[in-house]
């Protein structure tokens, strides 16, 4: 085993440890904000795993979609909701024990199956002496050419649709905030028999 394979295995072990610790944190942490950040760690480590395995487009898509969009949306949703102050010290009852036992059994079964499977017999990639490093790097470039060449009209229509949805969501949120402020100010103001102006 040469030094590059040793470094590759070490980086893979670090990334897999990050996935394991982040997923445990996402499940076991009681504070929902910390749980959402642990989920972000899992998504980031999965993206790094794709980078290490030379799947650069899948890694970039994972990073943009899951870390950049879904996890940020989850964190915002958790921070906007009104969480009770005493939710940090919730008691763990029988449901927690059942869930932990089920997850432990599932983890044991998956570990047994993964360990006893002959992965060399299941290879879907033809084993040849041709290096595929050149084609892996050009996949993103070819995808970009297709996306902005042959599929430019659906791509632009999708961007217009997303822009309209974003503007509509901002408009709804702004009107709702103005309604809440007006409602609070009307409730706190003393009642007078006069006009609003």
From Swiss-Prot:
Location comes to: Plastid, Chloroplast thylakoid membrane
Where this protein primarily resides, as one coarse class? plastid
Pfam assignment, any one: Oxidored_q3
Keyword Plastid listed? The answer is yes
Q: Which UniProt keywords apply?
A: Chloroplast, Membrane, NAD, NADP, Plastid, Plastoquinone, Quinone, Thylakoid, Translocase, Transmembrane, Transmembrane helix, Transport
| Name of the top EC class for this enzyme | translocase
Q: How does it sit in the membrane?
A: Multi-pass membrane protein
What Enzyme Commission number(s) does the record list for this chain?
7.1.1.-
Tell me the PANTHER family matching this sequence. Answer: NADH-UBIQUINONE OXIDOREDUCTASE CHAIN 6
Task: State what this protein does.
Answer: NDH shuttles electrons from NAD(P)H:plastoquinone, via FMN and iron-sulfur (Fe-S) centers, to quinones in the photosynthetic chain and possibly in a chloroplast respiratory chain. The immediate electron acceptor for the enzyme in this species is believed to be plastoquinone. Couples the redox reaction to proton translocation, and thus conserves the redox energy in a proton gradient.
User: What is its quaternary makeup?
Assistant: NDH is composed of at least 16 different subunits, 5 of which are encoded in the nucleus.
Family indicated by similarity: Belongs to the complex I subunit 6 family.
Please state what the protein is called.
NAD(P)H-quinone oxidoreductase subunit 6, chloroplastic
Q: Which organism is it from?
A: Adiantum capillus-veneris (Maidenhair fern)
């Amino acid at each position: 085993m040469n030094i590059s394979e040793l470094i590759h295995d070490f980086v893979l072990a670090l990334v897999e440890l990050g996935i394991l610790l982040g997923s445990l944190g996402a499940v076991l942490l009681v504070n929902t904000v910390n749980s959402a950040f642990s989920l972000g760690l899992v998504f980031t480590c999965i993206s790094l795993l794709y980078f290490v395995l030379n799947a650069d487009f899948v890694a970039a898509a994972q990073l943009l979609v899951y870390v950049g969009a879904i996890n940020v949306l989850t964190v915002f949703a958790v921070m906007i909701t009104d969480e009770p102050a005493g939710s940090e010290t919730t008691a763990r009852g029988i449901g927690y024990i059942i869930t932990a036992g089920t997850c432990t059994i599932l983890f044991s079964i998956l570990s047994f199956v993964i360990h006893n499977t002959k992965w060399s017999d299941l290879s879907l990639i033809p084993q040849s002496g041709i290096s595929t490093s050149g084609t892996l790097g050009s996949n993103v470039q070819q995808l970009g050419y297709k996306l902005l060449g042959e599929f430019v009209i659906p791509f632009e229509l999708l961007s217009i649709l997303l822009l309209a949805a974003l503007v509509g969501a901002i408009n709804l949120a702004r009107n709702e905030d103005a309604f809440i402020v007006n409602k609070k100010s009307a409730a706190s103001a003393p009642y007078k028999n006069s006009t609003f102006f």
